[in-house]
Amino acid sequence: MATTHDKITLQLPAKPEYVSLGRLSLSGIASRAGFSYEAIEDLKIAVSEAITNSVKHAFKGEEDGEIIVEYLIYEDKLEVRVSDNGTSFDLESRKQEIGPYEVDEDAEMMRIGGLGLFLIETLMDDVKLYYDEGVSVVMTKYINEKQVEENAKSIST
């Protein structure tokens, strides 16, 4: 059985001044979908980080780029896909360069860079990366935590 959803697409120039448009549109969409204030704040941070990563890393200021933000609104979740057609990267190599984060590490002493994906993975219920023509980050947030628990049970059994 196919799952139905509404889809909203936002096409942004890959420039820092447009990151806020992705965040603002997400806020309205998530509110309409029924997310709590706290969940909306988490979503806004994660999507801002994903768009900022595309602006900073995919195009590196050398070329005019474009970022596509797609919001897929389901009955029980919101899926956000941030895609660019810029330079791709190897996540595992990047993790090796950055190294692991220690729980007791002072935030002021953490290395600059590399926190974007860490934040996204922490704030969202599911995150997937795709490397086609550029990079796509697909982030999923369930509308209620009960759904997260149900999914966790089905995965572990």
Curated annotation (Swiss-Prot):
Keywords: ATP-binding, Kinase, Nucleotide-binding, Serine/threonine-protein kinase, Transferase. Its EC number is 2.7.11.1. It holds the Pfam family HATPase_c_2. GO terms for molecular function: ATP binding; protein serine kinase activity; protein serine/threonine kinase activity; sigma factor antagonist activity. It catalyses: L-seryl-[protein] + ATP = O-phospho-L-seryl-[protein] + ADP + H(+); L-threonyl-[protein] + ATP = O-phospho-L-threonyl-[protein] + ADP + H(+). The keyword Electron transport does not apply. Negative regulator of sigma-B activity. Phosphorylates and inactivates its specific antagonist protein, RsbV. Upon phosphorylation of RsbV, RsbW is released and binds to sigma-B, thereby blocking its ability to form an RNA polymerase holoenzyme (E-sigma-B). Belongs to the anti-sigma-factor family. PANTHER family: ANTI-SIGMA-F FACTOR RSBW-RELATED, SERINE-PROTEIN KINASE RSBW. This is Serine-protein kinase RsbW. It comes from Listeria welshimeri serovar 6b (strain ATCC 35897 / DSM 20650 / CCUG 15529 / CIP 8149 / NCTC 11857 / SLCC 5334 / V8).
